[in-house]
Amino acid sequence: MNQYQNKNEYEILESSQNNMNMPNRYPFADDPNAVMKNGNYKDWVNECEGSNISPSPAAAITSKIVSIVLKTLAKAVASSLADSIKSSLGISKTITENNVSQVSMVQVHQIINRRIQETILDLGESSLNGLVAIYNRDYLGALEAWNNNKSNINYQTNVAEAFKTVEREFFTKLKGIYRTSSSQITLLPTFTQAANLHLSMLRDAVMYQEGWNLQSHINYSKELDDALEDYTNYCVEVYTKGLNALRGSTAIDWLEFNSFRRDMTLMVLDLVAIFPNYNPVRYPLSTKISLSRKIYTDPVGRTDSPSFGDWTNTGRTLANFNDLEREVTDSPSLVKWLGDMTIYTGAIDSYRPTSPGDRIGVWYGNINAFYHTGRTDVVMFRQTGDTAYEDPSTFISNILYDDIYKLDLRAAAVSTIQGAMDTTFGVSSSRFFDIRGRNQLYQSNKPYPSLPITITFPGEESSEGNANDYSHLLCDVKILQEDSSNICEGRSSLLSHAWTHASLDRNNTILPDEITQIPAVTAYELRGNSSVVAGPGSTGGDLVKMSYHSVWSFKVYCSELKNYRVRIRYASHGNCQFLMKRWPSTGVAPRQWARHNVQGTFSNSMRYEAFKYLDIFTITPEENNFAFTIDLESGGDLFIDKIEFIPVSGSAFEYEGKQNIEKTQKAVNDLFIN
């Protein structure tokens, strides 16, 4: 978190005198751990501006791995096996060179305040590095040799034997030592990395079983399905258990809770959401994957300063667990794209009844405009904080089209008495780095010695992200303020930022040569008894819940007019019937419709096996922009995760005919078997 220090009884801002060697416990919004020397203000500011702030190593490394996996799956079929091997080598190299297992275990233990046992540290580090070593040397080496000469019997035998040996090692570790009861939470990021590699191997076996001449009596498709279910449920259950254990009552409790939620989303849940795409039967083409979840960086403030009270322990801010959780996070909703912001400047000062103090202009309130996917009109204006006028308001424009991937802020604070618990905090400056290079600035006209704070996420190649390589974009900014009616000195204005993954597409673009996944929460409208509910942890975002007499509407942009098979990934709490329609851009009358009945898929918890796939129809778009609706006509609750578009060769009529023949043949075969 952000540590500060006062220069005199009225001024603030540097890092703590005693924390030069303190690890960055709460990543992504940290101070540079710099201490002001005996110099003047300009020297100190110059020193601060040279500071380099980076995210926690474990989360940063894993975020890069997620970017590589997304890129690999997006080119899985379009590229050659040689390219796939190269990507796999890149993932394993990232794991070993950055010692992912060790840094992730240390990070988790820092969050949950437990002393890590050396035996567990050694176990996780040595086992994952050992698995990656044989994965690279034995399996990928043999796979590359076979790919270069597939007719060579020796290479065929070698890759089959290497697969069986290495796969057995992964299976044993993932079923055994990684699930040690006392260290499940600590080892979860390590488990997830190993599971990711194991699933990629099983996918290869399904795809190349015949070419490798693997044993025909082993059903590798079933092995893969079983592993997907097991690994997904295990990761979600352990994550949920660890998160719930961190619930508390204080602001410090919330910081640990939010840090765990954010880092484990990056280290575990993002990969888990990608797991289903390793099924080559269901995903035979390259796949465009979108993650719609949000993560929240810590409020821009400070903790652990010996000289002044901090925002986690003062009456000037929301400083308890429940208030912070309510104010910082959003309830599940359709994806809202941040369009623009109007920022208002107020003042904080060190006012005392006997003498006036120093006034500092800070960000005191803002009004955000939000858009839904596929809509050009503002769907919501939301204000947090006050519309103060210490300075003229600042307008940050065109955020909707210019992704903001990085922030540079200046945090300021004052207090009436050194060591008092009435310290007041605020942000006097914030620069927004966007992909167009405009880098708009909010700047108070009353600057003050202040601490530079950078908030950023790594790209695939860059450690801090840049306009051409970034993984997250800003989706919301809020001011956190409390009722200050009884506080004469003013109140704190702390900034909270929310971020979403850069894979999310604001246009719902359907690609012509890839399977396109579109999260259900990118709809533009819900009507009737429909709502958005929290996802189970494995879906990469929230779900649309449809109850009796509800309608879900969403728009898409089709980059090439060709045939696509449309299917949904869903879970159903009871049997239900729904009607899906395709509409032209004019919306006068539907072009196509299909009615489906689905069976209930779960009754209690929404685990991996609760989600099913349903083919709706095959479409032949007449125009680039069109829309879909689903009307739940009867039955239980339907939970929609995503809608998928699969490119189809030939005419829609030919494809539907082929599908009907295959269904009939399967029914006949099942009849004779039974």
From Swiss-Prot:
Coiled coil: none annotated. Pfam families: Endotoxin_C, Endotoxin_M, Endotoxin_N. One of its GO terms (molecular function) is toxin activity. GO terms for biological process: sporulation resulting in formation of a cellular spore; symbiont-mediated killing of host cell. Keywords: Sporulation, Toxin, Virulence. Belongs to the delta endotoxin family. This is Pesticidal crystal protein Cry24Aa. Toxic segment of the protein is located in the N-terminus. It comes from Bacillus thuringiensis subsp. jegathesan. The lineage of its organism: Bacteria, Bacillati, Bacillota, Bacilli, Bacillales. The gene is cry24Aa. Promotes colloidosmotic lysis by binding to the midgut epithelial cells of insects. Disulfide bonds: none annotated.
